[in-house]
Amino acid sequence: MEHLNNFDLFTIMSVTYFIAGIIKGIIGIGLPTTGMAILCFFVNPITALGLNLIPMTISNLWQFYRADNRLQIIKEYKFFVISIIGFLLISSFFAAKIGNQLVSAIFGSMVLLFVITNSLSIKFEKIKVNDVKLQFVFGGLSGLIGGITSLWALPITIYLFIKDVSPKHFVDVSGFFILMGCFPVFLGYYSTDVLSNEMFKYGLMGALFSLIGFYIGEKIRGGIKKDLFKKLLLIFFTFIAIKMIFDAFFK
């Protein structure tokens, strides 16, 4: 795969998703974002999209399996899932066509916009809109962004900020949303050769180390307060946004 041999890629996937798993264990999201950011140092963004999908799917399956009140989450957030799946089924077929630079630019710009609005003290949780409408709107945005970049946590985060949920509920629900989105993305990526058969062995290695990292991150998360939790999210997103925008315009 590109200029890397098997050992190199197994090593890169192991280290990358161990780090990504720790971040996901602490803040509930961030595994695909971290994975993409690190992998893009070694492979092009389109290849990174394919390698990213299997660790993302397995880690979020594990995250939702360990969630509280899974049936209640499914019932409460069903409209978000319907919306995200519908849009992902469309957008995931175009990831290979738009090019590596545009993938980086779209994602980095969206993340930076989110960080800026939060830094200006816009209180998302004070927005009063019917929840069903919010679910369809943010589910659709997640689907549009996620199919192209494989990174759909940003609209999910804004939606859950509006809901002003606890850190534990944030982790449980975001895991459910991302897991449900993985299935249509898998179909789109596999059909367009973004995800190839060769990638599965590397993806499974990444998934294994992501679960180890996730376990460690969970232990750290237990002592984090809600305000600190949100600050960690913003710091994390700022770093990723700058990196992706730089890649889009200067690589």
Report residues per predicted region.
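Selected transmembrane alpha-helices and immediately adjacent juxtamembrane segments
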Residues: 1-42, 124-174
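Structural signature of hydrophobic alpha-helical transmembrane segments
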Residues: 9-10, 40-57, 101-111, 140-150, ...
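A helix-boundary/kink motif common to multi-pass secondary transporters
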Residues: 32, 44, 99, 103, ...
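Small-residue-rich segments of transmembrane alpha-helices in multi-pass membrane proteins
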Residues: 37-46, 81-90, 114, 135-147, ...
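Juxtamembrane helix-boundary/capping and inter-helix hinge elements in multi-pass membrane proteins
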Residues: 41-45, 67-73, 161-169, 192-196
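Hydrophobic core positions of alpha-helical segments in small-molecule transporters
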Residues: 51-54, 79-83, 106-109, 172-176, ...
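Selective hydrophobic functional segments
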Residues: 51-100, 183-227
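Transmembrane helix exit motif
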Residues: 62-69, 92, 97, 106-130, ...
